[in-house]
Design a protein with these regions (language model features):
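N-terminal loops that bind phosphate or other acidic moieties
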Residues: 1-111
């Protein structure tokens, strides 16, 4: 089964998308969140290490689909792919779909 990673600049946004997706599919696939940065004064942003760890947490040879909200989230996801073991990275796809709609469509298709 393909699993998903939601990458967002906002932890609250990503958690909300993940919660909605999991409610719609009742846990049909695993979904991880990589969102926000560890800065209490400026929590908005993305972190390539968080993205890499999220991918590793739901990895399956069947694949991992990564959905992102804004431009620099794509850069973080691309960096995360470079940090992954190449054997693992070949099973990871980055998806340019709108974050909410794309995540919902992907979890329904994967479930």
């Amino acid at each position: 089964m393909v699993n998903l990673v939601v990458v967002s600049h906002s932890a609250l946004l990503a958690q909300g998308v993940a919660e909605l997706a999991q409610q719609m599919t009742q846990g049909g696939c695993q979904l991880a969140v990589a969102a926000g940065v560890d800065d209490l004064d400026h929590p908005i942003g993305t972190d390539a290490i968080k993205v890499m760890e999220a991918i590793e947490s739901v990895y399956t040879p069947s694949g991992v689909l990564v959905l992102m909200d804004l431009g620099s989230a794509l850069l973080s996801a691309e960096t995360a792919l470079e940090l992954l073991d190449p054997d693992m990275a070949q099973h990871v796809q980055l998806c340019a779909a709108p974050l909410v709609e794309g995540t919902l469509a992907a979890v329904v298709a994967a479930s």
